[in-house]
């Protein structure tokens, strides 16, 4: 009986430690996948890269990271659903960003940028986030 009572705190500690590790590991994998896709897309010479997209990064400074990811996913979704361009890569980015955001949002279309500039800025943000992960 004494052995069981001594094991309980150890098991709880292991459970907490592994859940933190798994959470951080998922963050790494998702960000790596996003960055890899962004590297692939931004290296392409494709006319789709000149399409205009809502500039969600021109949002106010008090916008949360989750809101930014949600708006970026929404803007990408608009591109690949309305244009037959880079659908496989953009839908994958949409899925990964939506997973990081875990919310729904709307996008203000008043400011625009090219898809290339949008993806370059998103890549910079993701690399900064990855360096902190």
Curated annotation (Swiss-Prot):
Q: Where in the cell is it found?
A: Secreted
Signal sequence extent: 1-24
Cystine bridges: 27-133, 48-85, 70-105
Alphabetical list of InterPro entries matching this protein:
4_helix_cytokine-like_core, IL-4, IL-4/IL-13, IL-4/IL-13_CS
UniProtKB keywords: B-cell activation, Cytokine, Disulfide bond, Glycoprotein, Growth factor, Secreted, Signal
List the molecular function annotations (GO) for this entry.
cytokine activity; growth factor activity; interleukin-4 receptor binding
Which SUPFAM superfamilies does this UniProt record tie to the protein? 4-helical cytokines
Q: Which domain of life, per UniProt? A: Eukaryota
SMART domains for this protein: IL4_13
The protein's recorded glycosylation sites are 62, 96, 102, 108
A biological process from GO? regulation of immune response
What this chain does, per the entry, is described as: Participates in at least several B-cell activation processes as well as of other cell types. It is a costimulator of DNA-synthesis. It induces the expression of class II MHC molecules on resting B-cells. It enhances both secretion and cell surface expression of IgE and IgG1. It also regulates the expression of the low affinity Fc receptor for IgE (CD23) on both lymphocytes and monocytes. Positively regulates IL31RA expression in macrophages. Stimulates autophagy in dendritic cells by interfering with mTORC1 signaling and through the induction of RUFY4.
Q: Which family does it belong to?
A: Belongs to the IL-4/IL-13 family.
This chain's protein is named Interleukin-4
Q: Which organism is it from?
A: Lama glama
The major lineage groups are: Eukaryota, Metazoa, Chordata, Craniata, Vertebrata
UniProt lists the gene as IL4
């Amino acid at each position: 009986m004494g052995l069981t009572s001594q094991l309980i705190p150890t098991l709880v500690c292991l459970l907490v430690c592994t859940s933190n590790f798994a959470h951080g590991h998922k963050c790494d994998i998702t960000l790596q996948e996003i960055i890899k896709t962004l590297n692939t897309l931004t290296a392409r010479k494709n006319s789709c890269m000149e399409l205009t997209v809502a500039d969600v990064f021109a949002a106010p400074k008090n916008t949360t990271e989750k809101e930014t990811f949600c708006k970026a996913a929404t803007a990408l979704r608009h591109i690949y659903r309305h244009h037959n361009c880079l659908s496989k890569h953009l839908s994958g980015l949409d899925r990964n960003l939506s997973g990081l955001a875990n919310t729904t949002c709307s996008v203000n279309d008043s400011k625009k940028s090219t898809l290339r500039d949008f993806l370059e800025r998103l890549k910079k943000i993701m690399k900064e986030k990855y360096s902190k992960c």
